[in-house]
Amino acid sequence: KTPGKFNSSHVALDDFTASISLKAFRQDTLNAAVRRLSFKERSGFDLKRFAFQVVANNKSLSIKDFMLELPNSTLTLEGPSLKYDSLQSIPSFTDDLTCQGNLMGSVCPKDLSAFLPPLEGIDDPMSVNLRYEGKGAEMSIPEIRLYNRKYMRFMANAAIRHWQGDGQEMQLEADLSRMHIPAEGLSYLSDKLKGIIPDIVGKLGHVDLKGNVRGSDTKLKVGGLLRTASGDLEADVTMDTDKNGRRSYSGNLSGVALDLGTLTSNKEKFGHADFNVELKGFNYQGKYPESNIKGVVSSIEYSDYQYKNVTLDGIYKDGGFNGKV
């Protein structure tokens, strides 16, 4: 019913192989191993090999020899372990429960296209390194690294609290140290993900992004600086979610030397622009964005004329601006 896409309601496996060993299974001891698990799913997902060994007692649990292999991907998990006062304490996520580990390897996006079909055309693998540690209801990822020479350099860290649903709001902190996509990589991704990535993204040239995220599942603050060959954008935005799940955005957006002519494919009309505006209540109503806008366009080039210090105070709605200029 969904060719080429995984459907959890209609799972069909071929070439299924499993080799499992159970050396010890007692009230306070577990020693088991999945020596090999492999199959092909009709969506196209191909699990070449999944293997690990788990050893546990009343104080700790460790996983050894973890290996996940897909046609063009390999992931290993080093040193994943849990420590606790007793097996009975695990479900409560108290501070007695700690964990740590390191995920590394190489992932080819195409191998995951059964779950995300747009990845079908991206057959260049990227290296992955993810280090994590946790205590109770707090999980931190001090290091996240993704790298492919052609299209991606990504470095970040993150922490999450109260993720297990203990009645408190989930808290998230994340810092993006750097995401760099060279011009060649941006062209490659825009071509492979045509129809998914907006056309304007392919016109940016190269991309360098730094930013951070702070907040909860109802109020999230996002800040970032985007540097491109077509100008720079800096944003400081707060996302609010009401009890009905509706989202609205408010904050500041500024642009420096933004090449509107290139971005709009209309160099005869537009040149560069510098601006600093405040958005309040930004959201989508139908197909158009809607927001209160207040700020200053320091400079904008239009039809071979440069306009300076243009003030804006009004509302953008239904594809048009209504207010004072």
Predicted regions: what is each one?
Residues 1-16, 23-325:
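Interface amphipathic segments
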